């Protein structure tokens, strides 16, 4: 029986670290020369340190961020997809957007490519229009 960590286990550890807001644990899961891209923004983060720093900024804006993982789908030993719903509320100004506790609920899919037991590349797919609408037009009912 192999003691190697599976792609599904790495994905599960990643989302546990996200939900614990543990940026150091996230950085440890990524290879030093890795990349992460939020496809909706198109600006990649390069390297585990930059990925961790970007996530830290996200947690400043959304300190209550929580991911509800619906599925972890493993294609093979080096590729896995995670479907999730992210729920959070904006608590700090994000560029021109002032924080008024606007709630967001975003469904997304993150595709992870692994190499040697580390995340080499992650691509996160979610709808930017939904995100922007929720930040701009949220009401207390949402």
Which residues does each PLM region occupy?
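C-terminal and inter-domain tail/linker signature
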Residues: 1-142
């Amino acid at each position: 029986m192999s003691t190697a960590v599976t792609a599904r286990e790495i994905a599960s550890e990643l989302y546990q670290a996200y939900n614990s807001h543990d940026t150091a644990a996230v950085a440890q899961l990524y290879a030093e020369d890795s990349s992460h891209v939020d496809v909706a923004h198109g600006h990649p983060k390069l390297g585990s340190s930059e990925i961790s720093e970007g996530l830290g900024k996200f947690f400043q804006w959304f300190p209550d961020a929580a991911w509800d993982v619906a599925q972890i789908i493993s294609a093979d030993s080096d590729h896995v997809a995670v479907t999730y719903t992210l729920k959070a509320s904006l608590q700090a100004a994000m560029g021109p957007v002032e924080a008024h506790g606007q709630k967001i609920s975003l469904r997304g899919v993150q595709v992870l490519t692994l190499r040697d037991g580390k995340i080499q590349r992650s691509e996160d797919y979610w709808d930017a229009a939904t995100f922007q609408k929720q930040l701009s037009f949220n009401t207390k009912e949402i």
